[in-house]
Design a protein with these regions (language model features):
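Short acidic low-complexity segments
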Residues: 30, 46-60
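Short glycine-/small-residue-rich Rossmann-like dinucleotide-binding loops
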Residues: 67-68
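N-terminal Rossmann-like NAD(P) cofactor-binding module of classical short-chain dehydrogenase/reductase
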Residues: 63-64
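N-terminal Rossmann NAD(P)H-binding glycine-rich loop of SDR-like oxidoreductase domains
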Residues: 8-20
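Extreme N-terminal starter segment of soluble prokaryotic enzymes
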Residues: 2-6
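NAD(P)-binding Rossmann-fold cofactor-contacting core
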Residues: 22-46
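Rossmann-fold NAD(P)-binding glycine/threonine-rich loop
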Residues: 76-77, 81-82, 89-113, 118-127
Length: 127
């Protein structure tokens, strides 16, 4: 089985850390890059986090974004140039920003969900 190469943004945040742990346990995934808004001088599972860039996302099949709206649009611009799939878990977008994400989704595959926490998903499943 071919692995899915992941780039995980916001790697120092709570969701970023959880994604890293989960992806490392699952043989279907390989983390090709981790990004953060500032330089980090430590390795996480052998990977040194980078700043969002074309080089950081080149090897990924999918970019997973759990950052802030400003960073999400940086990421979407790069993903568009590279024709990468994006999963957006970031929240707090304005209506104008939501429309812009919709425009990007006409060009590249985007999965956007405002809340991917276990508790919310369990609640949605039970109702």
């Amino acid at each position: 089985m071919k692995k899915i190469n992941l780039a995980i943004t916001g790697c120092m945040g709570r969701m970023g850390q959880q994604l890293i742990k989960s992806a490392n346990k699952d043989k279907a995934f390989k983390i090709t890059s981790l990004t953060e808004s500032r330089r980090i001088n430590k390795r996480i599972f052998g990977i040194r986090p980078e700043i969002n860039s074309i080089d950081a996302f080149k090897k990924a099949n999918v970019i997973i974004d759990f950052t802030v709206p400003k960073c999400t649009f940086e990421i979407l611009k790069i993903a568009f140039k590279l024709k990468k799939k994006v999963v957006i878990g970031t929240t707090g977008f304005t209506k104008k920003e939501e429309k812009l994400i919709k425009k990007f989704s006409n060009k590249i595959p985007i999965l956007k969900a405002g809340n991917m926490s276990l508790g919310v998903n369990l609640l949605m499943y039970l109702t």
